């Protein structure tokens, strides 16, 4: 008999072997119907997999996050089933789960159309209605190869070639359709009813632009109809907030093919940029940072010494001149070490905080570029703190406090923290990495924050703390980082004179709050739907006259507001005031000011805020209200 321990601590006995499905059925009919898969001794398994030893078992249902991901993965296989029925010559590639959904890459003779995707979705619904069982068969390698050879699935054969150590693989049968996968998958298509195909895109085989282009069908799936409906509404709202769309509508920026991944900033967009940069400069100055500027192009030998050439070369733009090879900087850190090294440093100089709004370039694949969110040329609010090991915790705490305050100023109050650990390709010894990772754990503990850990996600020179903000749509964006680096000071020979008159290496803390300013602006646009808070808006007020009689007074109002530090636009066009109000509303200015004869005579302004009429206000009182609103946002949050 097998002893099966359930999550509540109870133990049940079964004849060996027993499956997760059988255990669920023995507990109750409701659980049997809801069982998607199981977790046996910590490992996810299919509901049909045999258990042959005493084990701890959890029944996975659609209420569990793992259950939702299994449903999504099974929906990807269902895409394959439908595609092969409708387009028999299509070749199936891969179909993984992604955040809140899934996709399947498919090789086709001609690209799919939106009408094709609609037909695929309709066929998927027909297949779900058949309520068929998904059958898993562990298949020897040679037999799996034969199956895919007979079906002409060349990409599946290539994937098998990538797994020479695998002797048998799970083959999941959706009626006549067969796909291979680690699993687990749902036992029946009844779990897949709440799905939607969402998008069609192109993708290169293995993500390499030198390879053939595939068709990628995206979709989502949920446990309930209401969850699916809520997701679709969220996606529709996200489309309305798309920073590329709003960037054009609000006249902030544009991109064009002649400069892939580079941004053309328009006056309003550059005004927004300047507000952000100047605000960050003020905050950094108050926090004890010194601003610097480093070259954008440096000799190849410099990058070899720093380790970037070995570990990051594929992402760097290179050029040559006068028989010397150069690279455009992808990061600011090595340049900051040069400033630290330019002079004899003492322990009394530490911590030294060097900040730069550094212009960097990275050779991102063209297929990965996406508006402001993924670019090739960008500016970071970068800074590096050179300190002693004893100062790591206090500097991390100070940085964490600064970061949280700034995020609140921008409207982000929900911040989560991740600790990214050593990647496979890295510089430095394991002892150095042990020391660095433990240092960041101690710093996080001192900050009093909870965090999750991400093995393999650190930079090549050190582990990093990642700060993720949650926007108005509930999406998570990784922006801030704090990285602990013992490697670069060693490679670039940074040192300081200790209290005992010895020489020692400083610890280097790489840190950013916004990350890429381009990307952060994209996040801000979508978070605020283009309706920026007063302090942040590129144009804070637009002033409109009703007739020519008020034009001079409008100019006086504008001058007084500008003298008080506000960003103002005048609209003195010879148009009806209703038209001007509607026309300016598309730019989502925080305030609209209307001036007629009455306002002119009484030295007042008629104020509208986001379509709300605030009435006629004394100009000086209104300016005081505006100043208080900004104080509340930046100081009182």
Swiss-Prot record:
Its EC number is 6.1.1.3. One of its GO terms (biological process) is threonyl-tRNA aminoacylation. Keywords: Aminoacyl-tRNA synthetase, ATP-binding, Cytoplasm, Ligase, Metal-binding, Nucleotide-binding, Protein biosynthesis, RNA-binding, tRNA-binding, Zinc. Pfam families: HGTP_anticodon, TGS, tRNA-synt_2b, tRNA_SAD. It is found in: Cytoplasm. GO terms for molecular function: ATP binding; metal ion binding; threonine-tRNA ligase activity; tRNA binding. GO terms for cellular component: cytosol. Catalyzes the attachment of threonine to tRNA(Thr) in a two-step reaction: L-threonine is first activated by ATP to form Thr-AMP and then transferred to the acceptor end of tRNA(Thr). Also edits incorrectly charged L-seryl-tRNA(Thr). This is Threonine--tRNA ligase. The lineage of its organism: Bacteria, Pseudomonadati, Pseudomonadota, Betaproteobacteria, Neisseriales. The gene is thrS.
């Amino acid at each position: 008999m097998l002893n099966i321990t359930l999550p509540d601590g109870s133990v049940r006995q079964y004849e060996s072997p027993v499956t997760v499905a059988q255990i669920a059925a023995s507990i109750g009919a409701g659980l049997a119907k809801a069982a998607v898969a199981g977790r046996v001794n910590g490992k996810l398994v299919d509901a049909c997999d045999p258990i042959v030893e005493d084990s701890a078992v959890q029944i996975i249902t659609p209420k569990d996050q793992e259950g939702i991901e299994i449903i999504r993965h099974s929906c990807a296989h269902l895409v394959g089933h439908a595609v092969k029925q409708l387009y028999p010559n299509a070749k199936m590639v891969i179909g993984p789960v992604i955040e809140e959904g899934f996709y399947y890459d498919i090789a086709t003779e001609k690209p799919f159309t939106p009408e094709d995707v609609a037909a695929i979705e309709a066929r998927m619904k027909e297949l779900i209605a058949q309520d068929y069982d998904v059958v898993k068969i562990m298949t020897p390698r040679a037999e799996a190869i034969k199956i895919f050879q007979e079906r002409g699935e060349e990409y599946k054969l290539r994937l098998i070639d990538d797994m020479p150590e695998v002797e048998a693989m799970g083959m999941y049968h959706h009626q006549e359709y067969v796909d291979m996968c680690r699993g687990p998958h749902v036992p029946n298509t009844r779990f897949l009813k709440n799905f939607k195909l969402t998008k069609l895109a192109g993708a290169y085989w293995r993500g390499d632009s030198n390879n053939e282009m595939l068709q990628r069908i995206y979709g989502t799936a949920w446990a309930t109809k209401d969850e699916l409906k809520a997701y679709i509404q969220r996606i529709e709202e996200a489309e309305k907030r798309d920073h590329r769309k709003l960037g054009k509508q609000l006249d902030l920026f544009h991109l064009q093919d002649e400069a892939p991944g580079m941004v053309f900033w328009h006056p309003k967009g550059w005004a927004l940029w300047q507000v952000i940069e100047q605000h960050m400069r003020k905050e950094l100055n108050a926090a004890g940072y010194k601003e610097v500027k480093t070259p954008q192009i440096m000799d190849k030998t410099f990058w070899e010494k720093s380790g970037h050439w070995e570990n990051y070369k594929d992402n760097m733009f290179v050029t040559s001149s006068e028989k010397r090879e150069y690279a455009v900087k992808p990061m600011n850190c090595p340049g900051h070490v040069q400033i630290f090294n330019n002079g004899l440093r003492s322990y009394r100089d530490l911590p030294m905080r060097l900040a730069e709004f550094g212009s960097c370039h990275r050779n991102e694949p063209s297929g990965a570029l996406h508006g402001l969110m993924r670019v090739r040329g960008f500016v970071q609010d970068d800074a590096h703190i050179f300190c002693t090991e004893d100062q790591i915790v206090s500097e991390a705490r100070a940085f964490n406090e600064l970061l949280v305050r700034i995020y609140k100023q921008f409207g982000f109050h929900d911040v989560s923290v991740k600790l990214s650990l050593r990647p496979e390709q890295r510089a430095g010894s394991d002892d150095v990495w042990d020391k660095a990772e433990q240092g960041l754990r101690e710093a996080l503990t001192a900050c009093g924050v909870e965090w999750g850990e991400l093995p393999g996600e650190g930079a090549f020179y050190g582990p990093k703390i990642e700060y993720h903000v949650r926007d108005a749509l509930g999406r998570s964006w990784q922006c801030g980082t704090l990285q602990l680096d013992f490697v670069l000071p060693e490679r670039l020979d940074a040192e300081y004179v200790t209290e005992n008159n010895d020489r020692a290496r400083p610890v280097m803390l790489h840190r950013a709050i916004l990350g890429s300013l381009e990307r952060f602006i994209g996040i801000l646009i979508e978070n605020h739907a283009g309706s920026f808070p007063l302090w942040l808006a590129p144009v804070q007020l637009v002033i409109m006259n009703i007739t020519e009689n008020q034009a001079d007074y409008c100019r006086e109002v504008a001058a007084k507001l500008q003298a008080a530090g506000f960003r103002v636009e005048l609209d003195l066009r010879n148009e009806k005031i209703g038209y001007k109000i509607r026309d300016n509303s598309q730019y989502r200015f925080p305030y609209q000011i209307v001036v007629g004869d009455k306002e002119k005579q009484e030295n007042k302004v008629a104020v509208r805020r986001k379509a709300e009429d605030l009435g006629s206000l004394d100009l000086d009182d209104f300016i005081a209200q505006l100043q208080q609103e900004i104080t509340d946002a930046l100081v009182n949050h």
